[in-house]
A protein has these predicted regions:
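Core catalytic lobe of class I
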Residues: 2-312
């Protein structure tokens, strides 16, 4: 565990996420926003990396153990935003297919074949034969929930520009999950910065909203004063749990880069102004960029120093 870079706003650690987390003090982060390597998708060529476990159960347990430690590091009123994608069991080429041709570009042939065979056996042992959507996101979410995390939202990240897939016997994958967890029943959350702009309809008056023939209720006094009620919010409407955000390319980045708008939205809602955001899988630093843009401090962890170099450019 070593500090790779540090200034008054950013601290980057080089090392295994769990090992670094164990060295961090209690309550060091106000918010965690992260996207771990997906199960079985790609070999980044770094010993000890997440995502290369032989079975979903092993992957889920590593996630559970990591976030159990990070729960200590998170402030009592903090939130965890976890973006995680799914995988298919099988031998065919496709988006997030396990044991598929994508491994050819990621590892040596012998290593790839050995891992394929071990992973196939492990999947069959868990009663997940080829062609199955493994359901990794929900397996992880339920494991964290069983471990004491409070699952508040299962947000759909819809990708309007998702990459096409060469599959003909199922629909293309065009979304991923972003799970919102809290450590405690009462936590810091601000909906206003992420509200969607709303043009006031003609039946809005003084912050009150008309709904049919019902009388309205004054938000200030609680008294009925006509045919209006207080459901209209001048800051906009609740954005809901389906977020349509295009993917973006990051020159020189590793494969899994989510668009800055995604972590930025999580940070605005889930991290108090001036607070500290933590990403245990910092990668090319997208979460760090979002933290910087929103005036928060940042702690990033990655097992590959090359990604820290990329983030610092």
């Amino acid at each position: 565990v070593s500090v790779y870079y540090s200034d008054d706003q950013v601290t980057l650690y080089h090392g295994d996420a769990l090992a670094v987390a164990r060295e961090l003090p209690d309550g060091a982060a106000d918010c965690i926003v992260t996207s771990p390597p997906y199960f079985g998708l790609r070999d980044y060529g770094v010993e000890g990396q997440y995502g290369l476990e032989y079975s979903p159960a092993e992957y889920v347990e590593r996630m559970r153990a990591l976030f159990a430690e990070l729960r200590r590091v998170l402030a009592d009123d903090g939130t965890l935003w976890l973006n995680i994608g799914d995988s298919y069991a099988g031998s065919g080429y496709g988006n997030h297919d396990i044991n598929g041709d994508k491994w050819k570009a990621d590892a040596g042939l012998d290593r790839r074949r050995d891992r394929q065979q071990k992973m196939k056996k492990a999947l069959l042992a868990e009663n997940i034969p080829p062609k199955n959507l493994v359901g990794v996101p929900w397996r992880v979410a339920f494991a964290l929930q069983d471990d004491g995390w409070i699952l508040r939202n299962a947000i759909i990240w819809s990708k309007p520009n998702a990459m096409p897939e060469s599959v003909t016997d199922r629909l293309s994958s065009r979304y991923e999950f972003v799970f919102l967890f809290s450590k405690s029943r009462r936590y810091w959350f601000d909906l206003d910065p992420i509200r969607e702009p709303l043009v006031a309809p003609p039946n809005v008056k003084g912050g009150l909203f008309k709904r049919g023939n019902d009388s309205y209720v004054s938000q200030a006094t609680g008294t009925r004063q006509g045919n209006w009620d207080g459901t209209y919010n001048e800051h906009g409407r609740n954005p809901g749990d389906v977020w349509s955000i295009p993917t973006q390319k990051f020159p020189g980045a590793h494969f899994a880069v989510f668009p800055p708008e995604l972590p930025q939205r999580c940070i605005l809602a889930g991290c108090k102004p001036g607070g500290t955001v933590l990403d245990p899988f910092s990668g090319s630093g997208t979460t760090g960029l979002a933290a910087q843009r929103t005036g928060r401090k940042y702690i990033g962890i990655d097992i590959n120093p090359a990604y820290h170099d990329l983030a610092l450019k």
